[in-house]
Amino acid sequence: MSYNDTWQPKTRLGGLVQDGEVEDMSEALDTGLPLKEPEIVDQLLPGLDDEVLDINMVQRMTDSGRRVKFRCVVAIGNRDGYVGYAEGRDDQVGGAIQKAIEVAKLNIIDVSRGCGSWECGCGRPHTVALKSTGKAGSVDVELMPAPRGLGLAGGETVQHVLELAGIDDVWTRSSGKTRTTVNFAKATFNALRETSEARVPQHAREEREVIE
């Protein structure tokens, strides 16, 4: 693996990665050490794709007058089980996007995928392994395993996040103000986070070909 010679790690996990003691993202997350350096993700998951889900202009009155900032909502992923989400604010759109991408790297999760639908028995990691739910603001999102070939049965925002996570097929159910992109995207990410945090029984791993 090629490492960035100019990067000087500031955390224990960063040092382990740079020294080659931790060589993949799954191992890094399993250490339980906090992920506080985006360079760790750059090293272990190079070439991540990113998607700007929403750009909003936020105005605020200060003593010196009206101040304008941009808020960007971004999702990142390798389209093979890893996905991150974050919001970024800056005076410039480009700066807000870059800040969101850097924070999204720190929020990266390993999604549990598998062939979890009773309607399918292909054994491939094409859908979520188990039913999961996520909430953000007034929005609730439920993700359910779907048979291979169904596709992503959900809104555009949900689809973008799931595609970056490497989910090809899923049933979704949502409620609340789903037109609010920031909450819709965050609720979807939180549902995926639930899959990564769930303790999947061994028999379920075997039956559903769960990839964690």
Swiss-Prot record:
The keyword RNA-binding applies. GO terms for biological process: translation. InterPro entries: Ribosomal_Su5_D2-typ_SF, Ribosomal_uS5, Ribosomal_uS5_arc, Ribosomal_uS5_C, Ribosomal_uS5_euk/arc, Ribosomal_uS5_N, Ribosomal_uS5_N_CS, Ribsml_uS5_D2-typ_fold_subgr. Gene3D superfamilies: 3.30.160.20, 3.30.230.10. Keywords: Ribonucleoprotein, Ribosomal protein, RNA-binding, rRNA-binding. The keyword Ribonucleoprotein applies. One of its GO terms (cellular component) is cytosolic small ribosomal subunit. One of its GO terms (molecular function) is structural constituent of ribosome. Residues 48-111 form the S5 DRBM domain. Belongs to the universal ribosomal protein uS5 family. With S4 and S12 plays an important role in translational accuracy. The N-terminal domain interacts with the head of the 30S subunit; the C-terminal domain interacts with the body and contacts protein S4. The interaction surface between S4 and S5 is involved in control of translational fidelity. Part of the 30S ribosomal subunit. Contacts protein S4. This is Small ribosomal subunit protein uS5. It comes from Halobacterium salinarum (strain ATCC 700922 / JCM 11081 / NRC-1) (Halobacterium halobium).
